[in-house]
């Protein structure tokens, strides 16, 4: 199951495009949208917590990632068609989504992960968190619609008006969304975060499956969840919420700097250290000026702290495994330029020595060679 999900996320997750039946000037993949929604949800959570409300950020991240799995199976139903179906018959679409999830969960995989997916998706008790998720999705759709409507206004007019009306209804129920929509600086900050969808990895190579830094962060976060779960089963006491926050935030500077590849970073002594200073200065100049000082202090440890404690080590392992799977999917699509990189990364992954990472290498990577067609 895990290998199949990892494969689907890099396959359909990158090839599924938002607004795919609309003319558009911006390509947004399923994973790009998911990544931005997570970042918006976490920013709204921060704003809510400034008003002394406690938000379950772990639930936000897991619910959004787990709920996206259905879309990977039901890839042919776009968002607006889905909304119309829901408006006419919620029950029948719920049955369809349940069947899609069953197709995933019936595959062989760790039972505790399957149970966590089911429990998280069935937990409707967290009303504030669910409202934040709803708001984040609408806001992400709104930002996508703004871009494309500037050129194709006659096509997007009705959709844009519907999204704006929905946002207005939601902002009356959610103070953090009202604060976001009322604060131009916050919107500028999130615009820079959204730029991660346009910062691409492996830019020195031709790719069959181009992957943005935003999509990569979602993928790393899911891998971190898997590694944590398996390690936790074997006596680890690492804090998963902190791990997932490190995973989703750690590449934010690349919205400004772009993705500088590791060989370049390590080509001469001292260059890595200079880049770290540059990242901090560019974040100050381009992004942090739009947010309060306490938000900067909150988020900075997830971005700038070195990979030297156990949580950072797991996040770094997940980052490397993401590169491994990204290279693997290229090889499987006859892109031989990635074979040497794949073998080098695999050798590195073999040296990590954790139960979870050994399991990833020995079993899950083989799922990329299997042709599992998941249809309901």
Language model: regions and residue ranges:
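Alpha-helical, largely C-terminal catalytic domains
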Residues: 1-376
